[in-house]
Amino acid sequence: MQIFVKTLTGKTITLEVEPSDTIENVKAKIQDKEGIPPDQQRLIFAGKQLEDGRTLSDYNIQKESTLHLVLRLRGG
């Protein structure tokens, strides 16, 4: 299924995923497309931050859902 990931810059990334994919998997796919290390990615859906060990179906994320990607920058 396809889902969309919207970044803070307003860019939308399209990903091909399965409902059984973990959030960790999704972050890896984002890394493949965008080169952003998973440890800097925070994914938000329906106002909730998604945890790495959970699956898309755990959060009831279905086809054509839009997740929001927030970058956690190190340091500071």
Curated annotation (Swiss-Prot):
Cross-link Glycyl lysine isopeptide (Gly-Lys) (interchain with K-? in acceptor proteins): where in chain: G76
Keyword match Ubl conjugation: yes
Sites of the Glycyl lysine isopeptide (Lys-Gly) (interchain with G-Cter in ubiquitin) crosslink: K6, K11, K27, K29, K33, K48, K63
GO cellular component: cytoplasm; nucleus
Keywords associated with the record: Cytoplasm, Isopeptide bond, Nucleus, Ubl conjugation
InterPro entries per the UniProt record, alphabetical: Ubiquitin-like_dom, Ubiquitin-like_domsf, Ubiquitin_CS, Ubiquitin_dom, Ubiquitin_ubiquitin-like
Stretches assigned to the Ubiquitin-like domain: 1-76
Gene3D superfamilies xref list: Phosphatidylinositol 3-kinase Catalytic Subunit, Chain A, domain 1
Top-level taxonomic group: Eukaryota
Site (Interacts with activating enzyme): R54, R72
Pfam families hit by this protein: ubiquitin
Annotated site location: Essential for function: H68
Localization of this protein: Cytoplasm; Nucleus
CDD domains: Ubl_ubiquitin
Protein's job: Ubiquitin Exists either covalently attached to another protein, or free (unanchored). When covalently bound, it is conjugated to target proteins via an isopeptide bond either as a monomer (monoubiquitin), a polymer linked via different Lys residues of the ubiquitin (polyubiquitin chains) or a linear polymer linked via the initiator Met of the ubiquitin (linear polyubiquitin chains).
Family, similarity comment: Belongs to the ubiquitin family.
Other remarks in the entry: Ubiquitin is synthesized as a polyubiquitin precursor with exact head to tail repeats, the number of repeats differ between species. In some species there is a final amino-acid after the last repeat. Some ubiquitin genes contain a single copy of ubiquitin fused to a ribosomal protein (either eL40 or eS31).
Protein name: Ubiquitin
